[in-house]
Regions:
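Central regulatory/effector-binding core of bacterial HTH transcription factors
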Residues: 1-69, 150
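A late-sequence structural motif
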Residues: 14, 164, 188-233
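Hydrophobic hinge/microswitch elements
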Residues: 45-49, 57, 125-188
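Secondary-structure junction motif
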Residues: 95, 103-140, 171, 212-216, ...
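An extracytoplasmic/periplasmic, membrane-proximal ligand-sensing/linker region
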Residues: 233-248
Length: 248
């Protein structure tokens, strides 16, 4: 059994598809894959994922990096993930109708100074995506009206579509946002963040000198394809990470 770990949100967003496609792929020729025809998935934060890789509890993981990365672990970049600002149509009409589609903001860029009164959800403060957001907020000398903090970006989108609060969304969650919009008349609007050029990087994590099995190679290829799909999707919608979303 192939042991794969990632963070809770990423597990919910992409692991079901990866697990199903993986099992369909290796099931074509069972004898070549031995007992690694199925995946055992693990959820943990980045620090504990790194510990589990180092101790041999996981064959591989994908997440961000931390300063506590063990010396016997290697990493490879999979995805430069963008962070976006999300607000419902109802809340946009209430707080900033000038940002509605077709008006002056044709580039879909949100200046967070314009949204300081809007209630917002934030993720956990130790996450890299919140650190790069705070860098922008510090540069603007502005604080947000935070009404909810948790590590669940999919929950934040559900709160946003119910007009509880605006929120922030990583590129991996855009497909979930689009599914929400398909079922709701109160559409969620997505904006790039003015002054934010840093990305949230996702890495493949493995132990140094780890020997790949055939099944592991299949999963890594599928994971790389999925991350490439996410990168193309966010770039097609909002431009590449090399495009400047506007200075401060």
């Amino acid at each position: 059994m192939l042991k794969v770990g990632t963070t809770e949100g990423r597990f919910r967003m992409i692991m079901p598809d990866l697990m199903a496609v993986f099992e369909a792929s290796v099931g074509i020729d069972d004898k070549n894959y031995g007992e690694e025809k199925q995946i055992r998935g693990f959820m943990a934060d980045a620090v504990n994922l790194q510990k589990m890789i180092s101790s041999g509890e996981l064959d591989l993981a994908f997440s961000g990096l931390t300063p506590q990365m063990p010396a016997d672990m290697k990493s490879r970049l999979l995805l430069d993930e963008q962070l976006f600002f999300v607000i419902s149509d109802n809340m946009l009409r209430r707080y900033r109708p000038d940002y509605l589609p077709g008006l002056h903001n044709s580039e879909n860029i949100a200046d967070l100074r314009d949204f300081r009164l809007v209630p917002v959800c934030r993720s956990l403060p130790n996450l890299h995506c919140m650190e790069i957001l705070d860098t922008v907020l510090d540069s603007l000398h502005v604080s947000l009206n935070c009404v909810h903090v948790s590590g669940h970006f999919d929950l934040h989108l559900e709160l946003a579509v119910r007009d509880y609060a605006a929120c922030f969304c990583l590129g991996m969650y855009l497909s979930h946002l689009e599914r929400i919009n398909e079922c709701s008349e109160n559409k969620l609007h997505v904006f790039r963040i003015k002054g934010l050029s840093d990305t949230n990087q996702v890495f493949l994590l493995q132990k140094v000198n780890h020997m790949h099995s055939m099944a592991e190679d299949v999963f890594i290829r599928l994971l790389e394809e999925k991350c490439g799909e996410i990168a193309r999707h966010q770039d097609d919608l909002f431009g590449s990470v090399t495009a400047d979303p506007g200075g401060l």
